[in-house]
Structures are given as structure tokens and as C-alpha cells.
Amino acid sequence: MPSRAVRRCPGHLCKEMRAPRRAQPPDVPAGEPGSRVTWSRQMDFIMSCVGFAVGLGNVWRFPYLCYKNGGGVFLIPYLLVAVFGGIPIFFLEISLGQFMKAGGINAWNIAPLFKGLGYASMVIVFFCNTYYILVLTWSSFYLVQSFSSPLPWASCNNTWNTAACYEAGANASTEIYPPTAPAQSSIVQFWERRVLRLSSGLGDVGEIGWELTLCLTATWMLVYFCIWKGVKTSGKVVYVTATFPYIILVILLVRGVTLHGAVQGIVYYLQPDWGKLGEAQVWIDAGTQIFFSYAIGLGTLTALGSYNQLHNDCYKDAFILSLVNSATSFFAGLVVFSILGFMAVEEGVDISVVAESGPGLAFIAYPKAVTLMPFPQVWAVLFFIMLLCLGLGSQFVGVEGFVTAILDLWPSKFSFRYLREVVVAMVICLSFLIDLSMITEGGMYIFQIFDYYSASGTTLLWTAFWECVAVAWVYGGDRYLDDLAWMLGYRPWALVKWCWSVITPLVCMGIFTFHLVNYKPLTYNKTYTYPWWGEAIGWCLALASMLCVPTTVLYSLSRGRGSLKERWRKLTTPVWASHHLAYKMAGAKINQPCEGVVSCEEKVVIFESVL
């Protein structure tokens, strides 16, 4: 029998209601959300999230931002934005997938008017999957080259080197080269002239490199065979891709701290500069890094959550995963700056000269560092294996999230046995064709357009803002907490609702506005400025996702029937699945005693017909 406290809760379930919490949904026909495949073990979900969210940005972006923005002081805005911005949306996306039992698009049946959020996320994650794999392609190329002795980037005695080349670790001022030619290290020339075969600009695309084509093909094939059977197999692969990087990071840290100059590097990394707290850019960098590293706004966390058991404690999972993500970023900084400190001492320069972020750290700074160490091949192989594992974990789950959304939309009457394998192959083939443009001589310029615009902080912040609006304001923050109370067995902290309703949207919109106001045209290496049409392509990529939300809202409202109020009401009425009906009907029987002339049986019919 329900308690008196439960009977006094009109309209929805109270947190005190426990009876329906463990009630399982009725048998559901195949294809319905209730028959959805789930993780073999809950640890598969945890490791998949770690493999996806803990990626290259934790290793090559966070340490540099921490150093640039006041060292240890940067952790203050970073943690504040994480608590009030990153973690609430991280939890929102995972819990939404688990509650709706659907991927990034159908999960927004909770507020159908905002289903454009799902399409926006899928556009972003498709672009991200397409260009992100180039980093893995370059890493695999470097990995193969790392078995050479001597390392090919350590000397100037190669066919791709010019007269302006000087060897890594040497003093450029002692080398003789034409006075009109700028000096370039052997590391830079290997990267630009051997790997990228860099052309003069975006208008000079050039030829496709056959070596990178082989690396790209091999990488995509590895991705395909790891995810083609779904989470039952990919959930096992991520045990390797998610854990192996930590083993290598520990090995690199042990090696790094034994190098001369490592302490100075770590001091540079953590030394607080309290004056930085008053600079807006520090807070903006902290917020942008949180949204990047937590993989928010891509719809993939929603897809991963949809494979959870319905009553899994995703609230606890969200906090654990957020902690692991941020702790990994901090730990990676110790590794990176211990080695950068060694480089600075060896070359007799300030650490600001060698400090890099992004591809510059992975393919220039670190390869240069290993040339200064004994047994450089060993450290090069370990480093690039780590990059591959970090990148593959993110790539597996990113493609999985996109494929999940497509399969959720696929009409059941057109399903066949190998549907998933075919869809995965089609998605990868399409991405591969686009990637071919990025392994040409002008491919780096195309890669940067995708990186700067398609999955930038602007698009992610825009998506995250509307996610909060759709759940907290349209569906209702209290209403969603009631649903979570049924799903989890306890009510999440009320602060989460206030974050979704007020704090997180303000954080998102504040950083979004700052990005637009302080927009700077895209350049390559601070020397090449993109033509106007290159920027136009970039903004088209950004708007392709951002316009999904307002376009679908306006289209849905304009195509509906009845008054504007009636259209709004209909389009904001959730579309429930069978497991929701079991839960909602249990709540209706407890909280809404039959009154008036309408019988209980009639209420059930009305309820089902409306939904």
C-alpha cells in the first residue's frame, strides 16, 4: 500500500514514492525501447565514457592552458565551472539517454519541439568524427617511423630537408643557411615537408599522399571492426584504449621526473599567479576546456546512457567520470611539463619557448624531446601508442553515438539482419571520402577549418544552452527530478535543478557571447591567413549544426494545427515509450483517484491516446 505522503503528491510522483521504483516495465515488442541492448557489465559503460571523454585534449590542451592562465590559480575557475556547468550537463545527457532509452535524437522526445537539438548534436559529432581521425592517422604514421634508427626527424640528412634545416637540439645560430631562408628545425621540416607535404595555402590542394591514405584506411578499418557489432564488443575494446594510456602516462612521468630540469617545468606548470583571476580570458578558457574535455553537446553521452539498465545509478556515475576526467587532465600536465622543463634546460631557453598545445605538442615538441633522451625510439613508440589509444577510445564512442541515433530513426519495417554492420560501413565510407581532402598537400588547412568551426566551443555552448532550456524550462526541472527519483531510487540534489535552470545556461551564454565578440579570423601557424571563402566554408559548417535548433522549432510550430497555444502544448508533450507508460500509469493510479463521471478505465484510454 502506498504511504499517505505519496497520496498527497498531486500530478506527479514525490521523492518519497518507492513502490513503483523497482517495478519493471511490461513485456515490450522487439524494436521498442524496452528491448534495447544493454551493457554486459556496468563497468563497460564506465570505461566507454572514460575512453570517450578522456582524450587528446586532456593531454595536449589542459596543461598548456593551466600554464598560460596562472598555473595553480587556473584550477579555481576550472573547478567552479566544472561544478556549476560541466557536471550538471554531463549528468543531464547521460540520465536523459538512460531515462528515454534512446540515442541523441530520439531522446528529445521528452520535448519534441526541441528535437532539433538531437540533429544539431549529430551534425557536430559527424564533423568531429570526420576530422578527429586525422590525428590518429598522423599518430600512426609517426608510430611506424619511430621504429627507425636514427629517428627520421632527428637529422637534416633526408630528401625532404632544405638548406635552412638545423638538427634538433642544435643551436640554430651556429648553422649556415641562406640569409633569406628562415631557419627550421629538422622536427618542423619532418612535420610540414614529410608528413603534411604542406602547400602554399587553401587554394593549392595538391595531391593525395599514399602513405597517409594507408594509415587512414587502416585506422578506419580498426574502428569499423571494433564497433560493428555494437556495445557488446566495443564495450570490451575500450578496456584497452581507456586503461593503457594511464599505464604509459605513469611510465612517462617516472621518466620525466628523473630528467634534469623536470622540477623547474612542474613549478612553471603549478606556480600560482593570483593576478590572473581577474582576467576574463582565464575564466573563458576554463569554461571552454570543461565543455571540450567533458564531451558535452555531442549527443554521444546520451547514446552511451541509453544502453544502461533503467535503474542504474547514473548520478553517481556522472560524478565519478567527471572526477576521473579532471584528475587525468591535471596528471597529464605533470607529465608534459616535466618533459618541457627538461627541454628548456637542455636548450638553454625559457619554458615559454618550448611550451606548445594541440598538434604542436604532439608532433613537434614531444618528438623533439625524445631526441634529447637516451633510447629515443622507446619513448617515441610509447608516446604515440598513448596518443592512438586516447584517440581511438574517443573515435569508437563518437562513431557509436552517431550510428545509434541513425538506428533509432530507422523504420522497423525496413530492418534486416545486418542493418547495423551496413550502417556503420556507410557512415565510415562517407567520412573516409571527406577525409581524403585532408590528406592532400593542402589538407592541413582543411583540417583546421573543421577543427576551428565545426566542433568549436561556439557550437558546443550553443547546444548545451538549449539542452538546459528544453529540460529545465520546457519539460520542467522539478518534473524531471521526479522522473529521476523514480529511476534512481532517490532524488538528486536540488542544486542540480538550479544549475540546469539558471546557472549553467548563464555560463554557456556568457562564454558563447565572449567567443563571438572576440572572434578572430582563422590563421595557420600565425603566418597564413585564410581567404574570405575559406572562412565562409567554416561558418557554414558551424551554422549547419547551430541552425538545427531554431529551424526545427519554427518549422514544427508553422506546420502544426490549431492555435499557437495548442501547437505549443502538443509539441511540448513528451512522446513516451512503453517503460514510461508503466511508470506513469503507476503514478496516476496512486496520485490521481478517480473523480467525477470519468472512470479509471476511461482515464487510461485518454492517457494512452494523448501520448
UniProtKB/Swiss-Prot annotation:
Keywords per UniProt: Glycoprotein, Ion transport, Membrane, Sodium, Sodium transport, Symport, Transmembrane, Transmembrane helix, Transport
Name by which UniProt lists this protein: Creatine transporter
Region forming the signal peptide: none
Transmembrane segments: 45-65, 72-92, 123-143, 208-228, 247-267, 282-302, 319-339, 372-392, 422-442, 457-477, 498-518, 538-558
Pfam family, one: SNF
GO CC terms, sorted: plasma membrane
Family affiliation: Belongs to the sodium:neurotransmitter symporter (SNF) (TC 2.A.22) family.
Residues in compartment: Extracellular: 66-71, 144-207, 268-281, 340-371, 443-456, 519-537
Glycoprotein as UniProt keyword: yes
UniProt membrane topology term: Multi-pass membrane protein
Domain of life: Eukaryota
Keyword ATP-binding applies: no
InterPro entries, per database record: Na/ntran_symport, SNS_sf
